[in-house]
């Protein structure tokens, strides 16, 4: 109770401190680098990582891309090659004139060599960079190559995929976070007993999410998967804590007329229930840190940190906001559309052997379904990207015209 009473007494100071902490949190979030290269999360002793490091250190070649050029005269392709070679961090551009002078007709080449560069009205060149696949410099070079090459050229390769993936995530992340917030608001306004309380919850959880994203700065960088998932996951995982505090506060208000005393007891009751649950959740996320594929560590640390900040916000920021807005919250109360579940609860406890038997019967069915789902797991990121994305179009042309997947 000592902690609970301290929160109630210092509610104004807590809110002021939270607002002040938002400033460095925003800067930290903006300065945290987002990593789009899954190779960075593989163990250093894997052949792929060893090979990439050897190429970069011994030969000065890191990332590479294939460029398919359609319906362009040979002299224009040669001019394009010269322009691409001048792009910063482009180490080498390989095409026909890397082997022979363009004054010598391509048709004089042996068929096997000619077919390696040409098919129909299309020709192909390979671009090698002196930086890693997902380095910021490589992505900038990909964008510059696309702007130089024009609509007749299609840039494929892992670096092109990473560049498009970054642009797509930055474009769509605010959209699906906004959708999650709107849906959560609508659901809570309908199923809780106040029209205003969902927005109070979101303010409290939003502060915790922002602090979590800002504190990622100390990690140096996070993966794009972590960035894409963390905000929505944190919202979903910690929302229950806020609902529990609100229900506990309303129950205590019926016992204690003074709102501050009621809130102190509500915080104490919430801590008792939420701490055990949150520790289990945090432990589950931290278990990801033991994966050899260190994306698990990346996601595990960020989400464990998010749950911890969510709990702290639930028992400090949220009570302060509720006490500050107590009058409008009480005025906007309404009947919940959810019916009482007492009858259902009693019914379930009476026939619980039936549910146990049902579980035993269905478990093998769902295990079989799970096993079949594992057969369909894919690891090609290109399969989950929109068909009109530049990388997907370029990769399709490379596969169809040059039989390079």
Residue ranges of predicted features:
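Active-site-flanking beta-strand signature of metal-NTP-handling nucleotidyl enzymes
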Residues: 64-70, 123-128
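Extracytoplasmic
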Residues: 45, 49-50, 75-131, 163-167
